[in-house]
C-alpha cells in the first residue's frame, strides 16, 4: 500500500523537484481540495475523478454494547468518485 511519503517521492521523481518541494506541492493540493469541499464546492479533475461532499440522512442506530436504539444525526461526509480514465487504468 502506498502512503503520502511514497506519493511525495513519485512527484519528486516525475518533476525533478526536491522531496521538500514535492511535499509542499502535495500538501498544497490536499489543503486546496479540503478548502473547496469545506466551502461546499465539488472538485472535478477530468480523467481522474470527482471529490464532493455527500449528506447522510439522520437515522436510527443501535448501541452494540447495550442494544439500545439511538438516534444518529445527519452529517456530511467527503466522497470520491473515480473518473473513466482512472477506472480504465486500474482494470
Swiss-Prot record:
Protein name: DNA-binding protein HU
InterPro entries in alphabetical order: Hist_DNA-bd (IPR000119), Histone-like_DNA-bd_CS (IPR020816), IHF-like_DNA-bd_dom_sf (IPR010992)
Gene Ontology biological-process entries: chromosome condensation
Matches recorded under Pfam families: Bac_DNA_binding (PF00216)
Lineage per the UniProt record: Bacteria, Bacillati, Bacillota, Bacilli, Lactobacillales
UniProt keyword DNA-binding present: yes
Its biological purpose: Histone-like DNA-binding protein which is capable of wrapping DNA to stabilize it, and thus to prevent its denaturation under extreme environmental conditions.
Self-association state and partner proteins as the record states: Homodimer.
Similarity section: Belongs to the bacterial histone-like protein family.
Species of origin: Streptococcus thermophilus
Chloroplast is among the record's keywords: no
Molecular function in Gene Ontology: DNA binding; structural constituent of chromatin
Keywords, sorted A to Z: DNA condensation, DNA-binding
GO cellular component annotations of the record: cytosol
